[in-house]
Amino acid sequence: MNLSLKKNQRNYKNETTTRTKIGIVGSRAYTNKKKIKDLIFDIKQKLGDKAEIVSGGQQDGADGYVKKYALELDMNYTEFPPMHYKWNMHCKLPASQYDRPYYVSNFHKRNKQIAEYSDIIVAFIQPNTESNGTRSTIKYAEQEKKLVKIIM
C-alpha cells in the first residue's frame, strides 16, 4: 500500500513529536491478518522509528492483529482503549483515565481520541459486515481533516 506520509510536527495535549502517527482500526470481525501484517511491515520498511502505530486496544479482530504485529516488528506502539478497560503500558493516557464504569460512550470517546491523535487513519473493514466503531473513527478523522485509507 502506498502511504504518502510527510514528516510533520503534531501537538497532542502539549506533546510535540516528529513521528508519523498511523491509526490502524478495524472490525472485531476482520480476519485477514496477512493484510494487517503486510501493512505494518511496509510502514516499518518505509518509516522505521519515524512511525508510531496507534490502535484501539481491542483483543479481537483488527486491533488485536495490529498490536501483535506492531510489537513483533518492534514498532513504536500506542493504544487508546475504552475508559472501562484496565490501563496497560501501551496506553497513551494516564492510568487514572482507566478502570472506570462501563458506558457505550466510552467507545465513541476512544474513537475520537484515536482520530485526533493520529496523522492518518487506515481502516480495515470486513465486507458485508457492520462496523459502527470503525465507521465512527473514520467520521471523526474526516472531521479532523485527516487522511483516511479504507482496506477491505
Residue ranges of predicted features:
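Charge-dense, intrinsically disordered terminal/linker segments
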Residues: 1-16
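Acidic/glycine-enriched connector segments
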Residues: 12-20, 28-152
